Amino acid sequence: MGALSAHAQAPAAPAPAWKQGMPANMATSTLAPLPGKLTATKAADVPINRIKLPPGFKVEVWADSVPGSRAIAQGDGGKYYVGTRPLGRVYEITDNGTTRTSRVVIDKLDQPTVAYRDGALFVISVDKVLRFDGIDKNPTVAPVDLTAKFNLPPEKHHNWKYIAFGPDGKLYVPFGAPCNICEAPSEEYAQIRRYNADGSGMEVLARGVRNTVGFDWHPVTKEMWFSNHGRDWLGDDTPNDTMHRLKVGGHYGFPSCHQGNMPDPDVKKAKACDGVEQPVALMGPHSATMGVTFYTGNMFPAEYRNVLFNARKGSWNRTKKIGHDVVMVRADADGKNAKVEPFMTGFSNEADQSWWGRPAYLHQMNDGAMLVSDEQNGVIYRVSYSK
């Protein structure tokens, strides 16, 4: 047998997760995930006059110099904590009333997010779970490492997590699908889980959830509502991102069914959508529906109370952009009769398909104003209302 050629080619590297499911006729497509801007934009350089809101509302840059800002958790004593994704940082912002200062709590983590409860900051990344006890008063406190108790899967794709404590005092943690479209290698993916704060008592609440990165609890029913990203490479207009109510034990379709009624052409299954939980609302194809907050404050007019607000970061897998805004989902408490309406727009220009901002997460302040993080510009806006 002859020797192998020294020039024999090594096997081709597998396609990145976001390219999975790309049809052959789109192999030369220039569509690709949008890289984040990892430097901060100063408040004076943010074109805030382009942002549009309903009459009576105003917006200001509440904090800048927080590159990659995503989820926001409110601590005690005027402290706020902000997670990021590629930068691997967690920021602490101190609100001094008229000014804000920021510092890095921890960095060099893999896609960290934040939650806060009973004086402790919880930080979860792809491979770590850390708890900072009493951090508001002791900024240099060493974290307690809870990683071993949470059984974190290692895959990075769709494994940035939004986390939050529910009305039951338990910590809710999603685990996204490790691909654009695939049969997951194990059942630990495409789930929403619930834990006790120390990592014990893990329960799987929902399966077939491709990638939820935002949820909140209805103020009246106490049911969790969550956003979910649809798959890519099925065209500009399919499938939709979706908004759902959590049914414990429910299956939400991935990988064989999307938006509750659309069988997948690649991962085929007989009667693929039978028994799948249906969405409350369709949030637009590839819109990147992110943070979710029910408004319960008294600052906004009464017609906004108990309305669901949703930040849509903006599409990449679409020739015509969609998203780059904050919308409202007005629906009955049981999820029926949902209507999606614009609230905060102006981050993009439909005429030339340009955009300058990517709203990502929302947080209601104690006074009823709403914070909106802009991952692209590394700033946090404050939206308020006055007659």
Role assignments for model-derived ranges:
Residues 61-66, 103-109, 146-155, 204-208, ...:
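Surface loop/turn motifs at the tips and blade-to-blade linkers of beta-strand repeat domains
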Residues 89-92, 128-130, 191-193, 242, ...:
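A short loop-to-beta-strand structural motif that recurs across blades of beta-propeller domains
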Residues 87, 126, 140, 186-189, ...:
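A detector of repeated loop/turn-to-beta-strand junctions in beta-rich toroidal repeat architectures
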